Amino acid sequence: MNDHSNTNWNWSVTGVAIRDGKVLLARHTYGGGKGKWIIPGGYLENGESPTDAVKREFLEETGVVVDVEDVIGIRCGEKNWYLAFRVQWVSGEARSDGDENDAVEWMDINEAMGREDVPGLTKALVQCALNGRGLEEIPFETQHGGTLWGVAPSRHE
């Protein structure tokens, strides 16, 4: 497992990569998700942006390089938040990291949506990615730093 001593445990990210009617899933090896096929993701490292974190997590966990397209979901809890992105495959062959997962594959979307070992959250986020709508990064200099995400009219007109 990764050493998360330099990790902000309150902020995490995930991404949904869909290519040729298939979604990239990894079979988790520990915790409550052990044996479940999930979308890649993890915690932000200190000073890391959410978009950089999701790119890093995909590369570490699956060997796949992705570009971030838009935000498709936000889960806010009492002590944490979780951003879900739609991501686009750029390069790389899917492979297990041999640590956090023991298998990685491009799974047919219909198969994934019907499997009991694919959690509801993963299915919900795959459906969000398929809907074709999401929040985009909006070029805007924020007073306190960070990134503004919103619906860009030019994309959705």
Give residue spans per PLM region.
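Conserved N-terminal beta-strand and adjoining loop/helix that marks the start
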Residues: 1-23
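Short, solvent-exposed loop/turn elements at beta->coil junctions and helix N-caps
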Residues: 3, 71-75
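Short connector loops/turns at beta-strand edges and beta->alpha or beta->beta junctions
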Residues: 22, 29-32
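A short linear hydrophobic-aromatic micro-motif
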Residues: 25, 67-72
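A conserved beta-turn-beta hairpin within the catalytic core of GNAT-like acetyltransferases
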Residues: 31-35, 81
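A short gly/proline-enriched turn/hairpin at secondary-structure junctions
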Residues: 38-39
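Unchanged
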Residues: 44-68, 77-128, 151-157
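Charged phosphate-binding loop/patch that engages nucleotide di/tri-phosphates or the phosphate backbone
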Residues: 128-157
